[in-house]
Every structure is written in C-alpha cells, then in structure tokens.
Amino acid sequence: MSGLRTLLGLGLLVAGSRLPRIASRQSVCRAGPIWWGTQHRSSETMASAAVKYLSQEEAQAVDEELFNEYQFSVDQLMELAGLSCATAIAKAYPPTSMSKSPPTVLVICGPGNNGGDGLVCARHLKLFGYQPTIYYPKRPNKPLFTGLVTQCQKMDIPFLGEMPPEPMMVDELYELVVDAIFGFSFKGDVREPFHSILSVLSGLTVPIASIDIPSGWDVEKGNPSGIQPDLLISLTAPKKSATQFTGRYHYLGGRFVPPALEKKYQLNLPAYPDTECVYRLQ
C-alpha cells in the first residue's frame, strides 16, 4: 500500500475519513451540481426528444463523411471533442463547487480515439483550474497520440504507472473520474486491463463523467449492470444507448457538424446558445 501511495505522489490516505466531494452552497442558479441537494437547471437546458439518437452504423457513417467528404482530420475533431468534454465537466462540476483546490480528476484513457479525446480533455481541464491525473495503460505508437501525451507532460499533468486497485482509494484521491476508455466503435469483449478498471469504476462513490458512451455499454442497448456515470457527454449526436442513461447531466458536445450533413441524417441538433460548444440535453 505505501509503495502505491509513493507512486501516486499524493501522500498518506487518512483512514476512516471521507471529505464531502461537493461543498455546500447557497441557492444559486448555475450549471454546477449540489451533490446532496436540489439543483436549478441552466437556462440552456431543453427537452432532448427531438434530437436523433444514432445507431452504431449511423454514427460510423456520419464520422466517415466528416473525414472523407468534408475533409476533417482526426486531430482536428479530437481537439474539438476534448474541449467540449472539458467544458461540459466545468459546467457540471465547477471548480468552486469542489472540496479540494485545485479539484483532483482522474482521466482514464483507452487505446483508441476516445482515449485521445480524454488526453485533450485533461489538457483543457488543467487550463480550467483542475488538477488532472491520467491513467493511459495501452498507448498507440502513433505520432498523434504521442504528441498528445507530450503536451500533457509539458503541462505537468502526471501519468499513473498503475491503477489504484480499490474503489475506496480512487474515492479518497480524486473528486471526479473521466471515463475515456471506449467509444461508439468498440465491439467485442472487454479485455484486461480494462475489465479490471471497469470493475473498480463500478464501485466508486465519486461521480464518473463518460465521453460519448459509458465504457462497456452496448452502443445501442446500453448496460444496466455496467458503470453508471453521473455525466454523459455525447459527441456529434447522442447514441441510442444514451436513452438508458440515468445520471444527472447529459451534454451534447462537438459543435462542428456541417448543416448539410445534419440535414442529410436528420440529426435535429439543438441550437447552441451564443458561442457555446456544448448543449445540455438533460
């Protein structure tokens, strides 16, 4: 145990104590949560019934057109998506509402583009006043991803050598966990080390923010026995599994869909207010 604490570089855990994750606040109309109380919703919130929820095949088709027909690059969309995720997190969990200063966030990144979104998200969270830590166990040997890692390292964002093995340890060290493991293109069984990671996440009491879909969920059917995030950030358009989401905050991010593409797929995206890059659906 002491070796892992030294590895994390975060000092000794205080046994038997559990600080509240969200500081109590006066009744204020803002987008951030009151963890054990009531909340006023932001004026940007609207009913999400009109927004189209995509199947896995539809989501892949939209992505392919963005890359091929509209000539977006992977790193371009990744930057926009990661910024949207950090923005949604800052709206749901403002730094001033958290009990630690700066608020500690664990960002868990998978081996694909969803993990890249997580790396970008972590970088922007650092700029927004949070203290992110990244766990990135399976790193692709590609310039795009190595560049994102370097950017985070240059901003003094630490990378864990191993995942804390118990939910209680994560609860003590971090106030929020960002799930950037698997996106909508994932298929098949969840293998190690991610099976063990998801098992730890299932036992957390701190909130989880999932990027695009909760990792381990079927893209269309969801997974009631899997992790249950408090915040879901749908990118481009929500996926069908989002209809099974029961958390408090559902944001749409990625304000980059060309109007003609939106019309072709009848996405019925909401009108983002002013210059916002995210929109609260729930």
UniProtKB/Swiss-Prot annotation:
Modified residues (N6-succinyllysine): K138
Localization per Swiss-Prot or TrEMBL: Mitochondrion; Secreted
Catalytic activity reported: (6R)-NADHX = (6S)-NADHX; (6R)-NADPHX = (6S)-NADPHX
GO biological-process terms attached to the record: lipid transport; membrane raft distribution; metabolite repair; negative regulation of angiogenesis; nicotinamide nucleotide metabolic process; regulation of cholesterol efflux; sprouting angiogenesis
Transmembrane segments: none
Span of domain YjeF N-terminal: 59-269
Primary residence: mitochondrion
Known cofactor(s): K(+)
Cofactor binding mode and count: Binds 1 potassium ion per subunit.
UniProt entry keywords in alphabetical sequence: Isomerase, Lipid transport, Metal-binding, Mitochondrion, NAD, NADP, Nucleotide-binding, Phosphoprotein, Potassium, Secreted, Transit peptide, Transport
GO molecular function: identical protein binding; metal ion binding; NAD(P)HX epimerase activity; nucleotide binding
Pfam families in the record: YjeF_N
GO CC term, one of those recorded: extracellular space
Name of the molecule in the record: NAD(P)H-hydrate epimerase
Function, as annotated: Catalyzes the epimerization of the S- and R-forms of NAD(P)HX, a damaged form of NAD(P)H that is a result of enzymatic or heat-dependent hydration. This is a prerequisite for the S-specific NAD(P)H-hydrate dehydratase to allow the repair of both epimers of NAD(P)HX. Accelerates cholesterol efflux from endothelial cells to high-density lipoprotein (HDL) and thereby regulates angiogenesis.
PTM annotation, UniProt: Undergoes physiological phosphorylation during sperm capacitation, downstream to PKA activation.
Binding partners and assembly: Homodimer. Interacts with APOA1 and APOA2.
